[in-house]
A protein has these predicted regions:
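Short, surface-exposed, polar/charged, turn-prone segments marking secondary-structure boundaries
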Residues: 33-38, 65-70, 88-93, 126-129, ...
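Solvent-exposed amphipathic alpha-helical surface segments
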Residues: 27-31, 143, 147, 151
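Ligand-binding pocket segment of bilobal, Venus flytrap-like solute-binding proteins
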Residues: 147-166
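Short, flexible loop segments at the rims of nucleotide/cofactor-binding pockets, characterized by
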Residues: 39, 101, 163-166
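A conserved helix-loop-strand patch within extracytoplasmic ligand-binding domains
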Residues: 73-146
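Soluble non-cytosolic domains of exported or imported proteins
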Residues: 14-18, 63, 106, 127-134, ...
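Early extracytoplasmic/lumenal segment of secretory-pathway proteins
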Residues: 1-75, 85-86
C-alpha cells in the first residue's frame, strides 16, 4: 500500500518541494520498504493557512509567515503555544538569503554592509506584502544585531536598506 501525504505550502516553494519530495519518496521506500506519495498544494501563504484552518486536510504545512501558522493554531489544529518550543518564541522555519550580483561582482558585494552603499541597488519584494521579503528583512536585522550594534543603529541601517529596495 502507498501512503499519501499532503504538503500544503506557499507558492515560491513549489519547485523546491517537487525536487525534494521525489528524493524523499525514494529515500523513504529504501529505508522502510513502504511507498509514499506526496501530494502538493500551493498558493499564497495566507490563503493556504485559511484553507487548512477551514478544513483542507494537510499532513505537512510550510508557510511563509508565523502569522499564517498562527491562523492554523487559532483553529486549534496545532498547539497555540507552539512558538514557546523555540528560542525567543520564534517561528520554526529557516530561510537562506542569497545575494545575486552581476557577472564578476564588479561592486564587490559580499555582505549586508555592502547593500547600504549609495552605488548599490537592491531588488527584492516589498516586506509589507511578501513573506519572503520579510525573511530578507529579518536576515539583515539579525546580521547587524549579531555584530553587537545598538537597536538605534540597526534601525538606521534598515531605513537605508529599505530606501535601496527596488
Amino acid at each position: 500500500d502507498t501512503v499519501e501525504i499532503v504538503n500544503v505550502s506557499y507558492d515560491p516553494t513549489r519547485e523546491l518541494y517537487q525536487a525534494y519530495n521525489t528524493l524523499f519518496e525514494k529515500h523513504w521506500e529504501e529505508q522502510t520498504g513502504q511507498k509514499v506519495r506526496i501530494i502538493q498544494s500551493h498558493g499564497g501563504s495566507g490563503k493556504q493557512a485559511l484553507e487548512v484552518a477551514n478544513g483542507l486536510d494537510a499532513d505537512v504545512v510550510t508557510l511563509a509567515l508565523e502569522g499564517d501558522i498562527k491562523t492554523i493554531s487559532d483553529s486549534r489544529l496545532i498547539d497555540p503555544g507552539f512558538t514557546s518550543e523555540f528560542p525567543d518564541d520564534s517561528a520554526p522555519y529557516t530561510s537562506t538569503i542569497v545575494f545575486l550580483v552581476r557577472k564578476g561582482n564588479p561592486k564587490q558585494i559580499k555582505d549586508w554592509d555592502d547593500l547600504l552603499r549609495s552605488d548599490v541597488s537592491v531588488i527584492t519584494p516589498n516586506p509589507k506584502t511578501s513573506g519572503g521579503a520579510r525573511w530578507n528583512y529579518l536576515a539583515a536585522w539579525y546580521y547587524f544585531e549579531g555584530r553587537g550594534e545598538s537597536e538605534e543603529d540597526i534601525t538606521e541601517h534598515m531605513k537605508t536598506l529599505i530606501q535601496c529596495f527596488h
